[in-house]
Protein backbone atom coordinates (compact mmCIF):
# COMPACT_ATOMS: atom_id res chain seq x y z
CA UNK A 1 0.00 0.00 0.00
CA UNK A 2 1.41 3.40 -0.90
CA UNK A 3 1.99 5.94 1.84
CA UNK A 4 -0.53 8.33 0.30
CA UNK A 5 -3.24 5.66 0.11
CA UNK A 6 -2.51 4.64 3.70
CA UNK A 7 -2.88 8.27 4.79
CA UNK A 8 -6.16 8.76 2.94
CA UNK A 9 -7.77 5.54 4.19
CA UNK A 10 -6.63 6.22 7.77
CA UNK A 11 -7.96 9.79 7.60
CA UNK A 12 -11.32 8.65 6.24
CA UNK A 13 -11.69 6.10 9.03
CA UNK A 14 -10.48 8.44 11.78
CA UNK A 15 -12.72 11.32 10.74
CA UNK A 16 -15.69 8.94 10.34
CA UNK A 17 -15.25 7.59 13.87
CA UNK A 18 -14.89 11.13 15.19
CA UNK A 19 -18.05 12.23 13.38
CA UNK A 20 -19.98 9.27 14.83
CA UNK A 21 -18.94 10.21 18.37
CA UNK A 22 -19.82 13.87 17.70
CA UNK A 23 -23.33 12.78 16.64
CA UNK A 24 -23.87 11.47 20.17
CA UNK A 25 -23.99 15.19 21.13
CA UNK A 26 -23.66 14.86 24.89
CA UNK A 27 -22.25 17.00 27.68
CA UNK A 28 -20.67 16.31 31.03
CA UNK A 29 -21.02 19.06 33.63
CA UNK A 30 -22.20 21.34 30.83
CA UNK A 31 -19.02 20.77 28.82
CA UNK A 32 -18.91 19.44 25.25
CA UNK A 33 -17.94 15.86 26.04
CA UNK A 34 -17.42 14.44 22.53
CA UNK A 35 -14.06 16.18 22.07
CA UNK A 36 -12.93 15.15 25.55
CA UNK A 37 -13.95 11.55 24.86
CA UNK A 38 -12.24 11.53 21.46
CA UNK A 39 -9.04 12.97 22.92
CA UNK A 40 -8.98 10.42 25.75
CA UNK A 41 -9.69 7.46 23.44
CA UNK A 42 -7.21 8.70 20.84
CA UNK A 43 -4.52 9.33 23.44
CA UNK A 44 -5.02 5.92 25.04
CA UNK A 45 -4.78 4.13 21.70
CA UNK A 46 -1.84 6.23 20.51
CA UNK A 47 0.00 5.45 23.73
CA UNK A 48 -0.80 1.75 23.49
CA UNK A 49 0.41 1.47 19.90
CA UNK A 50 3.40 3.80 20.27
CA UNK A 51 6.44 2.53 18.33
CA UNK A 52 4.54 -0.52 17.05
CA UNK A 53 4.27 0.52 13.42
CA UNK A 54 6.52 1.86 10.68
CA UNK A 55 6.25 2.77 7.04
CA UNK A 56 2.79 2.85 5.46
CA UNK A 57 1.17 1.30 8.54
CA UNK A 58 2.56 4.12 10.73
CA UNK A 59 1.19 6.67 8.25
CA UNK A 60 -2.19 4.89 8.23
CA UNK A 61 -2.49 4.64 12.04
CA UNK A 62 -0.77 7.73 13.44
CA UNK A 63 -0.97 10.39 10.76
CA UNK A 64 -4.16 9.26 9.02
CA UNK A 65 -6.38 7.74 11.69
CA UNK A 66 -5.24 9.48 14.90
CA UNK A 67 -4.55 12.74 13.05
CA UNK A 68 -8.14 12.98 11.87
CA UNK A 69 -9.75 11.32 14.91
CA UNK A 70 -8.30 13.66 17.54
CA UNK A 71 -8.27 17.26 16.45
CA UNK A 72 -6.85 20.16 18.37
CA UNK A 73 -8.90 22.58 16.28
CA UNK A 74 -12.18 21.38 17.81
CA UNK A 75 -10.66 21.59 21.27
CA UNK A 76 -9.49 25.17 20.68
CA UNK A 77 -12.82 26.23 19.18
CA UNK A 78 -14.78 24.86 22.14
CA UNK A 79 -12.31 26.30 24.66
CA UNK A 80 -12.53 29.70 22.96
CA UNK A 81 -16.32 29.54 23.15
CA UNK A 82 -16.20 28.91 26.91
CA UNK A 83 -13.71 31.76 27.44
CA UNK A 84 -15.75 34.11 25.24
CA UNK A 85 -18.81 33.32 27.35
CA UNK A 86 -16.71 34.20 30.41
CA UNK A 87 -17.16 30.66 31.72
CA UNK A 88 -13.62 30.66 33.04
CA UNK A 89 -14.06 27.84 35.58
CA UNK A 90 -15.64 25.60 32.93
CA UNK A 91 -12.87 26.60 30.50
CA UNK A 92 -10.20 25.62 33.03
CA UNK A 93 -11.90 22.29 33.75
CA UNK A 94 -12.34 21.63 30.03
CA UNK A 95 -8.70 22.49 29.32
CA UNK A 96 -7.49 20.32 32.20
CA UNK A 97 -9.59 17.31 31.23
CA UNK A 98 -8.44 17.44 27.62
CA UNK A 99 -4.75 18.00 28.29
CA UNK A 100 -4.03 16.16 31.52
CA UNK A 101 -6.45 13.26 31.26
CA UNK A 102 -5.53 12.65 27.61
CA UNK A 103 -1.84 12.59 28.51
CA UNK A 104 -2.52 10.33 31.49
CA UNK A 105 -4.35 7.83 29.27
CA UNK A 106 -1.59 8.01 26.65
CA UNK A 107 1.00 7.21 29.32
CA UNK A 108 -1.05 4.51 31.07
CA UNK A 109 -1.91 2.66 27.89
CA UNK A 110 1.67 2.83 26.70
CA UNK A 111 2.73 1.24 30.00
CA UNK A 112 0.02 -1.41 29.57
CA UNK A 113 1.30 -2.23 26.09
CA UNK A 114 4.83 -2.66 27.47
CA UNK A 115 3.49 -5.05 30.13
CA UNK A 116 1.74 -7.14 27.47
CA UNK A 117 4.89 -7.16 25.37
CA UNK A 118 7.00 -8.62 28.19
Protein language model features and the residues they cover:
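Membrane-interface helix-loop junctions in multi-pass transporters/channels
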Residues: 1-118
Amino acid sequence: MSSYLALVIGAILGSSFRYFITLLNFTILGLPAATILVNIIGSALAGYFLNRFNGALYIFVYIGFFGSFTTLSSFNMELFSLVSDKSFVKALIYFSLNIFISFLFFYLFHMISIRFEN
